[in-house]
Amino acid sequence: MKGPMMADGRGGPGSRLRDMTAKHERPQDTGKTIARIFSYWKEHWSWLVIMLVSSLCEVFCTLMAPILIGKAIDNCIDLSNMTVDFTKLNVIVIMLLMLYISSSWFSWVQQYGMTNVSLKIAKKIRTQMMDKMLEQDIHFYDVHTRGDLMSRFTNDVELMKSGLGDSFIQLFNTIFTLAGTVVAMVALSPSLTVVCCMSIPVVFMMTNIISKQTRKFFSSQQVSLGQLNGLVEESVSGIKMVRSFGIEQQQIDKFNSINEELRKSGVKAQIYSGLLMPLMRVLENIIYIIVAVLGGIMATSTDMTVFGIGIATITVGTIQSFLLYTKQFLRPINQVASQFNAVQSAIAGAERIFTILDTKPTITNKPDAVTLKEETVKGDIVFDHVSFGYEPGKLILKDISFTAKQDEVIAIVGTTGAGKTTIINLLTRFYDINSGSIKVDGIDIRDITKESLRDQMGIVLQVPFLFSDTVNYNVSYGWPAATQEEIINAS
């Protein structure tokens, strides 16, 4: 019967390796991370096309509205005698209503598609992470706390999903809206368009400066959150040990320390990223005022020149249309700024996710590895000059040799930390030895498939672990094909 994995003994690697977790965070590469996030879109190209078309239609409806409003002012209102042509005005109002309804519907299509696809992508990433974590070596779990892994599995995936959904829709709308708005503004007044476009370099400069500061704080925030989850999980699962040694205050102090680091990194991330929105609003209002003043001058002046260049006069309706376009021109960039926190968190979370997905197990089967079969296995075990250490340069076992023949009952005794659990961990090839060899029936276990080697072993854990399921499920966990009679006999 295949047995479950061995838990760390008191002399095992324990938590002394887990402090290495934060050091294993890979360097940030935002460009590659973003490209990798969107690589998940390949199999959802049809929805991508639908959202692109919907985005174009929404932008078209949005851009047509200011033109109609300008026409209403110029064609429906006679400023000389203050009269209104309600017949024309009613037609324009109905057209505006249809445009706004259509714009809302196309926006809903985008949101529906993005929600649908982002949930599917999140599901795929969770599946990939689960597969990857189950194939990892035991050493992987020595250097990552369970809380940190759970944080990546839940919080980081959720952050990535949220950032992916919001930012992707915003990306489409920003590009299309900016392009369409600039074209419409140039058609109305090239000179005023130049004034508005002067704000673009300022926006990108502010975003670049702030993003460099916030990205590291968001990443630090996620690392601290993982450490906090790990400490809470260990404190709860090991509550008897904590109580037995009376170290409640020590755990509280450690929790408070990590919690404070989480607070500091969170505050810094939010403060720095929060600067962008107020700055964007100030810039938006400044541009709006400048356009309004210049537009008023152009509407009332019959012969206006700037640096010797003649500036065409414009109507009141054109000014109104242009002011609306000014808002639309800055709004997409403004909206990107409002999603800045989510995007930064998504990138930081994605990097932590991809770190797990890119981690390859070091203990693998050789291409020509043999498969042990139950009917041919005898069970002779030989440790031949075996040396091993969990950490480089720190050996737990030094030049150990012994033989356990078929049907022999062997007891391994020793003080805490002597290496009893380590011997079993090496026999099941949860770790690879530093030197020497371990053989089963004369075959080096490194030449045997891991799965067939462990299939021939029955292991009783030092601390039994029960899954949240039935008694039958737990008893037959290592042997799913067991009959009810076999389960009862084993119990």
Predicted regions, residues:
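Juxtamembrane helix-loop junctions of ABC transporter transmembrane domains
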Residues: A22-T30, V53-S54, C61-I77, L99-R146, ...
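A hydrophobic transmembrane-helix motif
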Residues: M64-P66, G70, I169-S211, V267-Q320
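Transmembrane helix-loop-helix hairpins at lipid-water interfaces of multipass membrane proteins
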Residues: L48-F106, V186-S191, V293, T300-T313
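ABC-type nucleotide-binding domain
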Residues: D358, N365-D368, L372-S491
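Cytosolic ends of transmembrane helices, especially the final helix of ABC transmembrane type-1 domains
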Residues: T115, R243-I247, I271, M280, ...
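Helix-loop junctions and hydrophobic alpha-helical segments within the transmembrane domains
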Residues: M129, M133, V242, I353, ...
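An intracellular "coupling" helix at the cytosolic face of ABC transporter transmembrane type-1 domains
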Residues: F38, E43, I138-H139, V157-L164, ...
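Membrane-integrated ABC transporters
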Residues: M1-T62, I77-I92, Q110-M114, S118, ...
